[in-house]
Amino acid sequence: MGNNSKLQNLFKHNGMTSLKSIIILMLLFLSNPMSVVCCPLSVDKTTIEIDNSNVKDLHDIINKVRSEVDDNSKVLIKFKKDRYDFYPADAQQREYYVSNHDQNQPKKVGICIEDWNNITIDGGGSDFIFHGQMLPLAIVNSSNVTLRNFSIDFENPHIAQVEIIENKGYNGMIFLVEPWVEYRINEKGYFETFEQLTMNNEQFTIDEWKYSQYTGIAFEKENRHIVYNTSDLWIDTKDVKDLGERKLYAPNWKDARLHPGTKVAMRTWNRPAPGIFLDHSNDTYINNVNVHYAEGMGLLAQRCNNIELDGFNVCLRGDDDPRYFTTQADATHFSQCKGLIRSENGLYEAMMDDAINVHGIYLKVKERIDERTLRCSYEHEQAWGFAWGDAGDSVCFVKANSMEMLEHKNVIKTICGQQTTDNGQQNSSTAGVKEFIISFEKELPEEINADVAYGIENLSWTPEVVFRNNIIRNNRARGALFSSPLRTVCEKNVFDHTSGTAILLCGDCNGWYESGAVRDLVIRKNTFINALTNMFQFTNAVISIYPEIPNIDEQTRYFHGGKHDAIVIEKNHFITFDKPLLYAKSVDGLIFRKNKVTRNNDYKPLHWNQEEILLERVKGVYK
């Protein structure tokens, strides 16, 4: 009989105390060098020590300890400082529907914490290196979880970095492929990157993934800024030729803006999984954790309550890192969360999208079933499949064409997911759901129906936000996006060459379906350095208040604001080569005061907007 069978029999004996069980458990595991070492710090606290001798058994270890401790026990999973490699073959497969990501299933999860409270994962300064396409770490349906002291990275990123060697103008481009990139010319004559992993005890290999990248971001070699006025590149590698020594000639890649020495992060728009996934969890604390690369966002949290980030970084490995990019999408993203989101002392750099985005999700009204019942749906292709609301949640309604919020508010009585299975049967499970049948406590106004496009916002799942003492630099698109009606404070941050807008307040019931009018926001004591070197969506000024409103002339109310000091922008320092500082649309209550502006000649003015402050349908402006 093996140790595991002995253990199971021992725990079947009646009358054995918890402490006695732990002592026997420790003795049995010490007799097997491949087993976890469980050290009883006290009756109610357990330490699980992980090193490279047992890391492949991590999921079994977690499950075993989870089954043997009570819900109030505090558990520490402690890694000996080292490099730990995680492979798809050893991963847990899960059907996770992740907001603002591709909904391909299943996800291959490296470290999976589900239905567990009072647990700490301490990496001890370790590197967690992932291979293939994986979701590195998931925290699901758990409370009081702490993550600290580790880094997440991938051995072979799906973004391919190259350096421009010669720009031949109309005759194409010669580029050098960086040494860590696995590449080939595929059967259609395109440059292709890939990763092969061994299968079946190394009897054969398969392509875990392969891409022919068609877009990219250009970085200056010396200072790592995104190249001025380049935005998203179009890359055509058809008929590429191998010149040897990792140099290739692409006759159809033509772009006069790319000079020799330019670093290009060649990419696709795919985003299958974030680095860290938080779902339906309460009180999550992340400290001293780095994400160096993920094929989605650095951290994605959905339907969570209270998240604290302190020293969470999406960053390069220092000034000498040969890579110029980090994550494929946002550094951090919070969808349909509540409680307090606190993000402090972070470094967010070189990602392919925003540093932080906080928002809810609009459902679209598809059918009025009766005076208290609606059929509603998720609309964006990357946001569906997960729970949207609960009985008792407060909701409001917005007319999509004008982003006019109705005075009517209601409360959910019942909400049921609706989806059709492969055999044509209706299934009310939340997983994979795109539509909901929602009944309400009060009768709905007659105007809410499918004849006019309406969205529903869940007011119960909106957070307070503190974003403080962070550095955001050298990234694509924008810096910080806030879309919550609750108190939001953005202060003492440095936005350094964010390439697009530094701060965006949006609200969109027509494209992204990201909800949240801003009612109580302070932006103060931040430094903005040379934003707007490139043009991206919604980037009308350094600070852009830009709800997506197809027909603003239909508005009778305002989307953002609602009191005289709803949005306060004060005591900031704008260091800029261009003109626009603030753009605002559909706001009631805006204060812009005591801000300092320093002009420079670092770049030529680029922006179409040459007004310092440009306002469109704004009421109650105080300077």
Go through the PLM ranges and name each one.
Residues K20-S35:
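Bacterial N-terminal signal peptides
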Residues K6, F11, M26, C416-G417, ...:
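Intrinsically disordered, low-complexity regions enriched for glutamine and histidine
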Residues M1-S18:
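N-terminal secretory signal peptides that target proteins for export/translocation
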Residues S5, N9-L10, L28, P40, ...:
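Short linear motifs centered on Gly/Pro in flexible linkers and helix caps
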Residues M26-L28, P40-L41, S73, Q203:
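N-terminal regions of proteins, emphasizing targeting and processing segments when present
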Residues K45-K623:
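Extracellular parallel beta-helix/beta-solenoid repeat domains
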Residues M34-S35, C39-S42, T420-N423:
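Intrinsic disorder
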